[in-house]
Amino acid sequence: FIFGWAPTVDGDVLPVQPFDPQAPAQSKGIPVMIGTTLHEFTMSTYVPAFRTITKEKAVEFLQKKYGERTDEFLTAFEKAYPGYQPKDLVDVDFVFRPGAVEQAKLKAAQQGAPVYMYMFAWESPVLDGMFRSTHCMDIPFAFNNVVRHASMTGGGAEAQALGEKMSSAWLNFARTGNPNAEGLPEWEPYTAEKGATMIFNNDCQVKYNHDKELLEVVMAFPTRGF
């Protein structure tokens, strides 16, 4: 666990190990909403050379990890994210997303209360777009604080419009267990078969198992983390 801080099962406050390979029966009837940002730790934010990286250089970087499966990775990446920029090859998150998908699958397999999956893909314009869809970028939108946190979001009209939609979804989920909200397409519960994921962006849309093949390639390699 990051930095050595870890939950401790005490039978009271934390009755079940949160990293158990099975979803706890205790919460079977409680709806869940889970998601990640597209870029999370956004390598190009911290490595300036990656901001203008060419596809050829990005492929060289990927070959160090994926070796002979690099072409397979690239094919799956193109399918998941058509029209991507070369820096997306190093920026798209594979630390949080696989675990979130696994958790959603375990919850859905209980066949109890629904689980809703999202991916936040809106890119901040701040500092010439350096942050992209970085870690925690979704939080000001969920709480509709995009103007208050303009140093992170830019506070512009597009950010405000998305903040209205996302905060409505979060409020509806808190009130009813269903995040569907005005201005958003129908948000279906997640299942392993369909993999419905709400993509939050200026044009919000639901995609189905859009990165399934890509994650299968990524998960074939044991090195995960940062």
Segments predicted by a language model, with ranges:
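Substrate-gating cap/lid region and adjacent catalytic-acid/histidine neighborhood
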Residues: 1-157, 169, 176
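Mature extracytoplasmic/periplasmic domains
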Residues: 171, 180-207
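Tryptophan-rich aromatic "cage" segments
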Residues: 203-226
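Short, flexible active-site recognition loops that position polar ligands and cofactors
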Residues: 155-156, 160, 208
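Short, solvent-exposed polar/charged micro-motifs at secondary-structure junctions
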Residues: 126-130, 195-197, 208-210
